[in-house]
């Protein structure tokens, strides 16, 4: 993580130096400034924001590349005080209890297709999130002592001149399933913590090829072939197939349904199927509503392997921008793992037919255009004792509090 921090400081210095040679941007081209705020830090951090933005702009123009990133640090507390190890149960990217964690120094570089007919995107994570992403997506050899650097995405893009154009990307890319995402600069999840659906219901990344086609101005379809769920290695010489459709009947409503099907185990016999349906509604400008239903099943994946494993979950998120600085997001969900196939990592073994639920409230405030602060309270429940308490007991609920700072450039 120290190497990642050094890289961040070096990149920051380059951007500031480059900004000294940047001409003043015309007022018409400048972004609209944030409104006044009691907690605004525009007076002291705003000049740094402007220097970095100007330096980035000049470097992008000189190189013909788009690039950026963010720095993310957070702290999470749990009412269960887990010990030995001090991991918060059924969490992943926010599982470290009572620690100030340098989560991420994220960088991306991309090239549009317009110059060469072929574009690319490469992005990487440096820090704790890099370690956890590597563990979660089976790139590492073991689930511990992973390096604090991980290649998140690396793919080429092109467009086949057929009809409206078939967009194709090949390489390592983030999944199309689910509401929540692996965050990108300026595109974060509405909450600090991730949902159970994100952690256990859907994959995170794929290695393969994915195409998309605009059938109609309201209809987009995608289809592709990948090595499987979160596994860059072809562990069974059988590809998995992805497909989906996105419907946009109006500017206010979007519905996306995506699925993946294929063999995920080493012997290649059991097949896994998952479909994720996400409805997005934006009835008024400050308000966004998200509703997700995800269903999955896998052959012979129950505890003991005596029957198929099935899981499903329902979640809803309401996000409201009270001002251009202040946002609140409320998330609620329920997730059922009927056969103990998905809720892995429980403190005292997996449970069949376990149901977990949570309600999360997150407040976000933009101290400047680039500096975002967030606080969160979350309550988890289960019909089983699945949440570790102390060193040797488990409980049916837990409460967590979290704080986060994100600096985007």
Language model segments and positions:
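N-terminal periplasmic/intermembrane-space "pro-region" immediately following the signal or transit peptide
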Residues: 2-85
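Outer-membrane beta-barrel pore domains
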Residues: 30, 41, 91-94, 130-133, ...
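Outer-membrane beta-barrel channels and translocator barrels
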Residues: 62, 112-116, 161-164, 175, ...
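Transmembrane beta-strands of outer-membrane beta-barrel proteins
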Residues: 67-73, 118-122, 166-170, 221-223, ...
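Residues on the lipid-exposed face of transmembrane beta-strands in outer-membrane beta-barrel proteins
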Residues: 69, 73, 102-111, 153-158, ...
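Outer-membrane beta-barrel pore domains and translocons
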Residues: 72-76, 123-127, 173-175, 224-229, ...
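Surface-exposed coil loops of outer-membrane beta-barrel proteins
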Residues: 80-99, 129-155, 159-250, 256-263, ...
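Glycine- and aromatic-enriched membrane insertion/assembly motifs of diderm outer-membrane
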Residues: 92-129
């Amino acid at each position: 993580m120290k190497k990642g921090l050094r890289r961040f400081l070096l990149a920051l210095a380059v951007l500031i130096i480059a900004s000294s040679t940047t001409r003043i941007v015309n007022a018409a081209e400048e972004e609209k400034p944030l409104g006044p705020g009691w907690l605004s830090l525009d007076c002291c951090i705003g000049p740094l924001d402007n220097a970095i933005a100007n330096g980035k702009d000049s470097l992008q123009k000189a190189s013909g590349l788009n690039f950026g990133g963010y720095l993310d640090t957070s702290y999470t507390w749990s009412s269960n005080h887990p010990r030995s190890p001090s991991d918060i149960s059924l969490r992943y990217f926010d599982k470290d209890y009572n620690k100030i964690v340098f989560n991420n120094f994220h960088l991306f570089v991309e090239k549009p297709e317009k110059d060469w007919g072929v574009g690319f995107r490469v992005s990487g994570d440096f820090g704790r999130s890099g370690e956890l992403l590597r563990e979660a997506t089976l790139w590492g050899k073991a689930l511990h002592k992973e390096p604090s650097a991980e290649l998140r995405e690396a793919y080429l893009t092109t467009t086949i001149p057929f009809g409206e154009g078939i967009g194709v990307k090949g390489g390592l890319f983030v999944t199309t399933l689910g509401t929540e995402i692996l965050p990108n600069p300026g595109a974060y999840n509405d909450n600090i913590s991730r949902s159970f659906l994100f952690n256990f219901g859907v994959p995170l990344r794929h290695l393969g090829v994915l195409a998309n086609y605009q059938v109609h101005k309201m209809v987009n379809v995608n289809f592709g072939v990948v090595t499987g769920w979160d596994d860059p290695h072809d562990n069974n010489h059988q590809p998995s197939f992805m497909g989906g459709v996105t419907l946009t009947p109006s500017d206010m409503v979007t519905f996306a349904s995506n699925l993946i099907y294929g063999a995920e185990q080493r012997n290649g016999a059991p097949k896994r199927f998952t479909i994720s349906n996400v409805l997005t509604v934006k009835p008024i400008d400050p308000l966004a509503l998200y509703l997700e239903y995800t269903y999955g099943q896998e052959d012979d994946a129950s505890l003991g392997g005596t029957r198929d494993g099935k899981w499903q979950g329902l979640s809803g998120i309401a996000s409201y921008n009270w001002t251009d600085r202040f946002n609140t997001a409320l998330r609620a969900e329920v997730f059922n793992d009927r056969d103990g196939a998905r809720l892995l990592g429980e403190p005292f073994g997996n449970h069949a037919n376990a149901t977990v639920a949570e309600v999360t409230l997150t407040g976000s405030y933009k101290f400047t255009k680039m500096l975002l602060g967030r606080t969160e309270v979350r309550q988890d429940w289960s019909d089983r004792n699945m949440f570790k308490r102390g060193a040797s007991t488990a409980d049916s609920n837990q409460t967590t509090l979290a704080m986060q700072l994100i600096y985007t450039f």
